Amino acid sequence: MAVISKVTYSLYDQKEINATDIIISHIKNDDDIGTVKDGRLGAMDGALCKTCGKTELECFGHWGKVSIYKTHIVKPEFISEIIRLLNHICIHCGLLRSREPYSDDINLKELSVHALRRLKDKILSKKKSCWNSECMQPYQKITFSKKKVCFVNKLDDINVPNSLIYQKLISIHEKFWPLLEIHQYPANLFYTDYFPIPPLIIRPAISFWIDSIPKETNELTYLLGMIVKNCNLNADEQVIQKAVIEYDDIKIISNNTTSINLSYITSGKNNMIRSYIVARRKDQTARSVIGPSTSITVNEVGMPTYIRNTLTEKIFVNAFTVDKVKQLLASNQVKFYFNKRLNQLTRIRQGKFIKNKIHLLPGDWVEVAVQEYTSIIFGRQPSLHRYNVIASSIRATEGDTIKISPGIANSQNADFDGDEEWMILEQNPKAVVEQSILMYPTTLLKHDIHGAPVYGSIQDEIVAAYSLFRIQDLCLDEVLNILGKYGREFDPKGKCKFSGKDIYTYLIGEKINYPGLLKDGEIIANDVDSNFVVAMRHLSLAGLLSDHKSNVEGINFIIKSSYVFKRYLSIYGFGVTFKDLRPNSTFTNKLEAINVEKIELIKEAYAKYLKDVRDGKIVPLSKALEADYLESMLSNLTNLNIREIEEHMRQTLIDDPDNNLLKMAKAGYKVNPTELMYILGTYGQQRIDGEPAETRVLGRVLPYYLPDSKDPEGRGYILNSLTKGLTGSQYYFSMLVARSQSTDIVCETSRTGTLARKIIKKMEDMVVDGYGQVVIGNTLIKYAANYTKILGSVCKPVDLIYPDESMTWYLEISALWNKIKQGFVYSQKQKLAKKTLAPFNFLVFVKPTTEDNAIKVKDLYDMIHNVIDDVREKYFFTVSNIDFMEYIFLTHLNPSRIRITKETAITIFEKFYEKLNYTLGGGTPIGIISAQVLSEKFTQQALSSFHTTEKSGAVKQKLGFNEFNNLTNLSKNKTEIITLVSDDISKLQSVKINFEFVCLGELNPDITLRKETDRYVVDIIVNRLYIKRAEITELVVEYMIERFISFSVIVKEWGMETFIEDEDNIRFTIYLNFVEPEELNLSKFMMVLPGAANKGKISKFKIPISDYTGYNDFNQTKKLNKMTVELMNLKELGSFDLENVNVYPGVWNTYDIFGIEAARGYLCEAMLNTYGEGFDYLYQPCDLLASLLCASYEPESVNKFKFGAASTLKRATFGDNKALLNAALHKKSEPINDNSSCHFFSKVPNIGTGYYKYFIDLGLLMRMERKLSDKISSQKIKEIEETEDF
């Protein structure tokens, strides 16, 4: 099949519809001939096509037609286009509406775009009547009536026949088409002689069962039958038009219907493009429950017998395979034989006669049951990233379940509690070769962004790794027994006694070094914990090995170590019993006694406070502050439990060093003090969305407690531990949380999946070009992919070493730091980066040496400097800043830290060039990789408990999925959270006083009303402590009351006095007369007074000012004050003195003030912050997404393709069902370059692996060279001028 490079969309014209000779004229008929189910319309359900004689797979269907007897039927989706054109012509004479007469000798094709636009404004008039002297009729507005199902004159609702509209539109001369934006013959908007009947292939039957009898129906076939029926009856135009609209898109005439029609099956989640083209059901697939197997390696997958006997693989007949095929036929192993000459597939069964069908010529193939070691793709859904779908070698295993190695369970998010996986056996030999390289676990070992291995030990293996390292005094036989099948090459080197460390050295098998961890392949750390053996850890031994050599060595270590750990467990055993957790009841009894005592003290103190408030001895705290104090007391109780448990663990380790539970804790597998607290101490406060359960009827959650009870246990504090067991009420509270969490998980899975799909659609066409830049089509997004132009899985986070006077080259390092430090002090100066990105893991090549053998200090500096200068020019074209790389090499290879030989230095920089040259290739789909990593992480996060940054009633800057969703949707006209930071608290206080919402009711006033002879008197007594607590003054309270009364329309006359009652209280007395009806208005006034007398912006949030330590540099901190406030616009801050106050606005305010580049920076950091701590490695994908959203002049939402030239097919697969209609209407022509279009037309997309194909635009290189030479020459001239001036 030829490669399609361009596609043009247009509407079928009537000649094409008339050209088919399959006439449909019956509603029902024997054998369905002449009906809408006619066998000539294509092959269906195993029957051959009666037109071309081909099968379902080969026949694309044939169109039929039904006569509509010269009736003019409008194509329903283009009704709005016809109305648009009618608004530009006179319905009476057919001439264009114009302000003045126009001549027909204008050549519109010669006009420029601007001239054409001016002419449009001039001609397309808004006048009331026609300029044509022979017509002079008033212009009529034509609309489409849903009720009558035809065009009508809006003025008098009289029908306008379709034939009249047809005549007027086709009479518009072709030369005026550009003026009206007509792209093809207007007759194509109508059906005239015949209506087309689509092939059977686009209307597959929907099966359902009634009384266990299968029925088949198809809504489209029924609707087409109705059109044929009406045409046969020669029905009125409106009747046929209605039938056509019901078939095409019923929503045009009826809003509240969900019946299936053409529009329905081409839009929404289950549209035909997504269901049948982008992805569809396949054969040669299997699905089963998964289980673990200890006998298979990471690169293998165990397949049960019944799947192996069902799936078949092809063997093509050629000179190399013909003998093997004959053997298979002779041994009766062939299931199918395909004869290419006869185009015939034969099923081979016992006793079946197959004479003269088998020729075994090149091109034929046989299908046999799938064999061991064949590559098969398998995966677990949901497939959140590419490690969920991999291709491994098949191994025969017993039982009925698919078996996987436990080492890959983490990467597939699989556990063995009934999870299922699917598998597909690809038939095309090219596909098999491709998958066996690109999807092989060895290829995928390291995470695309994080750089750590995605495979590693799980569960018991982690404990085995810890215990094995600590074992001592092993004889050779014991070592060989532990090593099992890998022990044959073990060299004792004359030793009689061995330790676990020796076994690790043998397993590592390379002379590898890593600071503080490895020396010449020997582990120098104190213990081997989970960080060394599990997946997604930078200290993983498998990762360090693959950084040092290749992924093959990394995978080999995982396979060998996993085998050895399992053997260790089977020999020495490991088990945890309840006795390990709780040898006796002494400790739990002690903890319980402490908890009961403390909770009683808390209750007592709280009850005393409530009594004193009731008796008027003290002024109550605000509700938020009261809840905070209670929460902090309960938190102290929780912390006390954790401290007691930590001490207990420490003591147990001294008394019983072989306690298996504590071994697990030390190994970093399960059981931390918090988990132990739930089991042994107290189950703690139950929260829903981060808050204790809300009180309901009678001021309580459950009827176990008294009405309006303030008991902490009545709000979900569970005192019992799980060992003791929960009481009824405690169980209800724990289930209350479980209910809300399970609801959240169901809803969040759907929401995160939707956003993930949008982000992937948005980013899928973002690839790396031949120069290591990130592009979409011809648009440059980033100068340097991954900042290093090296594959993301090769880059490595390393410690950021700050300048120190003890360092060699201190001045140079310090100068570099001053240039780059802004990037490492972030999040409003609250955080200082601890890690930075190294271009590759060069630390595994750093081998310490003595002072005598070390490279000279100056030589090393010159080498680093020369390499960076060379890389800057040759690889980054001096366009990108790579100072961070120079800083890393200068600090990590600093002679004050470590001395290395010249050979080591040369090795490091040779490896550096190797990574630059060979890892990141043209076509690397960096967009999809980044989108998947972001999506996978926010999905995980949305399903775990959410967290926020602020407490105490302030506006919460939410972390997690919700905030990420808001940032990517980029909704306008919403309030934004503005942060103000200053070292001068008074500047923030003036903003706070003006903006913070305080109403009279919050000050707990004592309001009394009395009536005097000619007026009402209202006394408001307020305790001054409340005024102070609200951080306002008595004058502000007076102003609040005064302002409310003066603006009140129900007050006729008023006066006000302020009195100081005593040292604690102040009284505001108001004298009032109301407008009629006086009683009613008095009631209204008294009802709204506590809330309506207020100041500030109405908001449920307070505006507290908090202080924090801000970083100016790694060694310079400053006390700063911070305040967050919700504002619509920064103009509201215009009247304040904000000199030396840092204002951090939201994304739209940032864009409005500082422009698109600042908005990009803001979006990147804001998206990264939603992930919380420990996700710094997501900076690169966040930056890439932010750069894409801000690639044009204005930030663009992930929901839209407003700026990018997104293809019609991309829009259609994204869910825009109007995309194809608009493309056809405007006769669009588009190249097939993007992912969606390539998928649709079976073209290989221009994305690759970075292994084989480079796309280099030589023109770009020449332009770049010219620019660089111009830049260098102008620099030289400047230098000469400066020298002359000197």
UniProtKB/Swiss-Prot annotation:
Signal peptide: none annotated. InterPro entries: DNA-dir_RpoC_beta_prime, RNA_pol_asu, RNA_pol_N, RNA_pol_Rpb1_1, RNA_pol_Rpb1_3, RNA_pol_Rpb1_4, RNA_pol_Rpb1_5, RNA_pol_Rpb1_clamp_domain. Belongs to the poxviridae DNA-directed RNA polymerase 147 kDa subunit family. The keyword Acyltransferase does not apply. Its EC number is 2.7.7.6. Part of the DNA-dependent RNA polymerase which catalyzes the transcription of viral DNA into RNA using the four ribonucleoside triphosphates as substrates. Responsible for the transcription of early, intermediate and late genes. DNA-dependent RNA polymerase associates with the early transcription factor (ETF), itself composed of OPG118 and OPG133, thereby allowing the early genes transcription. Late transcription, and probably also intermediate transcription, require newly synthesized RNA polymerase. The keyword Oxidoreductase does not apply. SUPFAM superfamilies: beta and beta-prime subunits of DNA dependent RNA-polymerase. Keywords: DNA-directed RNA polymerase, Nucleotidyltransferase, Transcription, Transferase, Virion. GO terms for cellular component: DNA-directed RNA polymerase complex; virion component. It comes from the Viruses. This is DNA-directed RNA polymerase 147 kDa polypeptide. GO terms for biological process: DNA-templated transcription. One of its GO terms (molecular function) is DNA-directed RNA polymerase activity. It is found in: Virion. Gene3D superfamilies: 1.10.132.30, 2.40.40.20, 6.10.250.2940, RNA polymerase ii, RNA polymerase II, clamp domain. Pfam families: RNA_pol_Rpb1_1 (PF04997), RNA_pol_Rpb1_2 (PF00623), RNA_pol_Rpb1_3 (PF04983), RNA_pol_Rpb1_4 (PF05000), RNA_pol_Rpb1_5 (PF04998). The gene is OPG105.
